[in-house]
Amino acid sequence: MATAGRRGGAASERRERRESRRQEASPEKSNFLERVVTINRVAKVVKGGRRFSFTALVVVGDGNGMVGVGYGKAREVPAAIAKGVEEAKKHFFTVPRVQGTIPHPVIGEAAAGVVLLRPASPGTGVIAGGPVRAVLECAGVRDVLSKSLGSDNAVNIVHATVKALRALVPPEKVAVRRGLPLEEVAPPALLRAKAEAGV
């Protein structure tokens, strides 16, 4: 009986902590886009049987060039998602964009997942499957072509997409590295935008 009482007390404490974390995080929810890519139930075999918990892969971004991916694990789905969101916010990085698309084609690989991303003209939209689309939309990429060339495992695809986005290099940096004027390496869309802005 004492053991059951301790378990009940611990469970109520966990619920209170979850509620407090949820209340603290709620004001920030409007500032970020959150996409739950996959939720998986896992089991750990212990002396008394199997103990179930949930894992959640979450993508968080500001829709304006910042994105991160997090992995959360907890006894309940909402808590796993909340942990994933916090983990994603710790791993934010900046995605170079040119007129709503990416500056150049790129391939990202993670385990057996391989993702190809290519720039697209304005109005094309995000041509991508679920996991890739979640990352690109949270990053604020509006026009892009993509193709998954490897595993269809959502976790691998998401991490491959993140690696591809991290490998992008802004045209300005390419010009400096090569010692060339920006006009020779930048996409025409960027040059037109700079001309219209008078930069």
UniProtKB/Swiss-Prot annotation:
Coiled coil: none
Basic and acidic residues composition-biased segments: 12-27
One Pfam family matching this protein: Ribosomal_S5
Presence of keyword NAD: no
S5 DRBM domain mapped to chain residues: 32-95
UniProt-annotated stretches for the region Disordered: 1-29
Single Gene Ontology MF annotation: rRNA binding
Name by which UniProt lists this protein: Small ribosomal subunit protein uS5
Gene giving rise to this polypeptide: rpsE
Origin: domain of life: Bacteria
